[in-house]
Structure formats: C-alpha cells, structure tokens
C-alpha cells in the first residue's frame, strides 16, 4: 500500500469508529478481513496511526481550533493535523499523500492546505493548552485528578496515555 492508501484506510476507520458503537478492535478486524491485500507492515502502520490519532484527539482538535480554520475537526482534518504535528510531514508531503489517486484521499481543499501550512513545525503539546487537553483526559475529571495528584498529574496521566 502507498502512504496515501494507508492514510485513506485510517480515515475510513476513524469515520466508522466515530459514527458507531462497535469496539475498535472488532471494526479493524472486519476492515482488514475484507482487505486481504494489506500486508502486515501496512496493518501495523495503519493501526499505529489510528491509535495515535485517537490518543491525540484533544490536542489535535485544540490546534485545529487555534488556527482559526473554518474546518470541523473530523477524520480528514485530524489526519492532516497528525501529519503536521506528530509525524512532522511538510505541507508538500501532506499534499503528496492527499493526491486523489486510486485508494488515496482526495486532494486537499484550500482550507485544508492552509491548515497543513499553519500546523507544520509546531509541537503537538503547547504551553497554552489546558491540562485536560494537554494530558488527554475529560474536562469533568480535572478537579478530581488535580486533587488526587496535585504534584504528579502530568506524570500519572502521561503513563496512562
């Protein structure tokens, strides 16, 4: 599979995950059973990117909102952000992945290309992020977790993610 085809697979899986109630492992098993052509390296890469996007969701969404983009935080947008922030793909590399070729994601729209440009070179975690975003836990747990681990919150939450 090409890098673009791998990213398209991640986008398709994220769409299924966020639109249903099926467990992720079951969705990925069914997805790959229907796509026997995907080798073990492809599956490993797709799983790694998929779980990275899930683990980084709050930070990706924060960055997407921070750019002032009119784009909604959805599977495509989060992949673009993941490529720029975590994988460190340049805007040109991101455009090469989103090339519209067979089995690849459709070409980037102008707002998506602007997002890739705006996020490239930035760190995934920013000092202005609130704790629930930076450490990837729900807002409603903030007070309880800060009470439980007043000095070790970052260490403990990093261990969970």
Segments and roles (model prediction):
Residues 1-161:
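Class I Rossmann-like S-adenosyl-L-methionine
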């Amino acid at each position: 599979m090409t890098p673009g085809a791998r990213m398209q697979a991640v986008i398709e899986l994220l769409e299924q995950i966020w639109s249903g109630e099926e467990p992720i492992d079951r969705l990925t098993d069914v997805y790959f059973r229907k796509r026997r052509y995907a080798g073990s390296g492809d599956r490993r890469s797709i799983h790694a990117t998929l779980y990275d996007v899930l683990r980084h969701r709050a930070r990706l969404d924060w960055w997407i909102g921070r750019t002032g983009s009119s784009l909604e935080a959805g599977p495509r947008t989060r992949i673009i952000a993941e490529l720029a922030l975590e994988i460190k793909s340049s805007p040109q590399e991101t455009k090469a992945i989103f090339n519209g070729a067979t089995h690849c994601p459709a070409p980037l729209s102008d707002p998506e290309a602007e997002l890739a440009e705006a996020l490239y070179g930035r760190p995934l975690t920013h000092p202005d992020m609130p704790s629930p975003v930076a450490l990837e836990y729900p807002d409603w747990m903030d007070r309880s977790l800060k009470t439980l681990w007043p000095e070790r919150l970052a260490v403990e939450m990093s261990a969970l993610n």
